[in-house]
């Protein structure tokens, strides 16, 4: 799919929709290669969430092992892939994937706000590491409706954008810039640790060591989480033939 400009997941009373910026025929002509596209739109048309799309690719590229395998993608939104074991009673489970909630989006917006637009992200997690997390607010936020939903579910910047950041900052009242970055950073870590343990039996997943993509090294506030450690992982693909 192309760049996602707008995404609205489905509800029981409303069809989902998504707006992608992509000209697949032009891309096919320029590359002189077949281009398979519109996976997101097709999934939504069939009643799916339309996101995340990466779980199938994760399963195809990495395969199954003797136990559960978890893969975490920390983009603007955190999405999680859980690949079941290759054998045993749990080997019949399907690959699971869903959007946990905000990863970098609230952090980046907070950095942009408190740097007056001079910075767009928290380099090496330095700003979060210099602050203190408002733990009480993280616990309250985890009770919000989206975070209580079970998979499948998807979300985007439409829900966790600038307005959402402003709402959270107003809730915390007087907060330093560093604390305003440390707290949503902690929220991202809590969401990822929170979701697998809430899956209904028999899909309840034991604690996982999660590889991290995009931002290969987790920021200090995320790495310091008391939950299962995050192990950096890089996937190397073979060079194209010829």
Model-derived regions, located:
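Conserved ATP-utilizing enzyme core subdomain
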Residues: 93-193
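Catalytic phosphate/nucleotide-handling subdomain of diverse soluble enzymes
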Residues: 84-86, 109, 190-242
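Short glycine-aspartate micro-motif
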Residues: 69-73, 95-97
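Conserved catalytic cysteine-centered active-site region
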Residues: 21-22, 26-45
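Short beta-strand-loop/turn "lid" adjacent to the catalytic site in phosphate-handling enzymes
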Residues: 1-21
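Acidic, glycine-enriched active-site microenvironments
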Residues: 13, 179, 183, 219-220
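A short acidic Gly-Thr/Ser loop motif
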Residues: 73-77, 101-103, 210-220
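Active-site glycine-rich loop that binds ribose-phosphate moieties when present
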Residues: 19-23, 49-65
